Amino acid sequence: MKKLISAMLAMAMCFSLAACGAKEEPAPAPAPEASQPAEPAAPDDIAWPEGTVNVTLPYSAGGDTDTYCRALFQRVGDKLGQTFVVTNLTGGSGIVAAMDVMGKKNDGYNILFTHIGAALVQEATQTVDFSYTEDFTNCCTVAIDQTYALVAVAKDGGYKQYSHGWETLEDMLAEAKANPGKVRYSTVFGSTTQYVGMMLEKDAGVTFDNIDVGTSSGDRMAALLGGQVDIVAINYMNVKDYIENGDLICMGIMAKERVNGIDFPTFVEQGYPNVVTAKKYEVKFPKGTDMAIVDKLSATCKEIVESPEFAEVLSKYFAEPLYRDAATMNVEDPAEVEELKAGLAG
């Protein structure tokens, strides 16, 4: 036992002497942590776009949607140093273009530019079997138009042979009440015009003969001036000259409040609170597009939307700049669909 204790003491002394004589070594570096996934690329860091980007819009050349789209993406291209090619793909009140973009690659090189006036009505009425609010990746909103006007042929204008002699909204509604289904309303099924027409029928207690003569403003104006329909709901800019010339009468504007530059009462003022609509113009990608790309384009669009030059383009149509990011759209657009459903069911 004594031998064992002596041996242990000897070993302890050896270790102690060795420690005293050795140089002090730096503390070992901590073990590396487990590798973490890379952070998503910041919008400014992502190498996009590196080539031509395709932008599809669902309406004809020369209209408000086309004008805003081309004005926007010309400026986007200038800022990002690439070409954004705009293609007009009409049909189905925007459905054809929407489905076309849905079926394309979500690589950041395919974009849908549309206004959601018609789109959300289609979703609320289940006209489409897809969702504008869920089956795309939202990018941003760039403008709003609240200038839908209800017009008819004036009794003393150049098209007076097609006039009913109306001078006011109440004149037209009186005839519609006296002759249910006789006043011919130019609708576009599955669109904003269908919705506001239904709201006016409900608020005023009338029934129109709803006739779909085509989706473009040109088609519907030709039908009005040719006597095929009696009343048309249309963007004010498309009828401004006719009204000022005395060829058409404006019976009201479908906005919540008076629109700057348009000296006509709203339907709300005239006692029809549900005859309200607004067209918000949005940029969307195919679902699953990299959010770094989405955010980069959104930030670029925000700069343009806030510029005086873009506001001037919109003002020619009495529209206004409106920027909303994807997060805002993801909340507000589905809520608007539910409001439309409630209005149609109420």
For the regions a protein language model found, what residue spans apply to each?
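Short, low-complexity disordered leader/linker segments with a strong preference
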Residues: 1-52, 346
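N-terminal (or domain-start) structured segment
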Residues: 34-137, 182, 189, 206-231, ...
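An extracytoplasmic/periplasmic, membrane-proximal ligand-sensing/linker region
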Residues: 50-52, 202-208, 291-346
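Hinge/capping helix and adjacent helix->loop/strand transition within the periplasmic-binding protein
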Residues: 76, 103-108, 124-219, 267, ...
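Short helices/loops that flank or line small-molecule/ion binding pockets
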Residues: 95-106, 174-177, 198-203, 218-232, ...
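A ligand-binding cleft/hinge motif common to bilobed small-molecule-binding domains
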Residues: 117-129, 194-203, 226, 230-265
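C-terminal lobe and pocket-closing loops
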Residues: 239-307, 331, 335-338
